[in-house]
């Protein structure tokens, strides 16, 4: 699950 920059990625458990 990729979101916009700075958003929290629930499935990834981090930020992109």
From Swiss-Prot:
GO terms for cellular component: extracellular region. GO terms for biological process: adaptive immune response; blood coagulation; innate immune response. The keyword Disulfide bond applies. Cleaved by the protease thrombin to yield monomers which, together with fibrinogen beta (FGB) and fibrinogen gamma (FGG), polymerize to form an insoluble fibrin matrix. Fibrin has a major function in hemostasis as one of the primary components of blood clots. In addition, functions during the early stages of wound repair to stabilize the lesion and guide cell migration during re-epithelialization. Was originally thought to be essential for platelet aggregation, based on in vitro studies using anticoagulated blood. A long coiled coil structure formed by 3 polypeptide chains connects the central nodule to the C-terminal domains (distal nodules). The long C-terminal ends of the alpha chains fold back, contributing a fourth strand to the coiled coil structure. Heterohexamer; disulfide linked. Contains 2 sets of 3 non-identical chains (alpha, beta and gamma). The 2 heterotrimers are in head to head conformation with the N-termini in a small central domain. This is Fibrinogen alpha chain. It comes from Ceratotherium simum.
């Amino acid at each position: 699950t990729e979101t916009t920059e700075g958003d929290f990625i629930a499935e990834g458990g981090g930020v992109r």
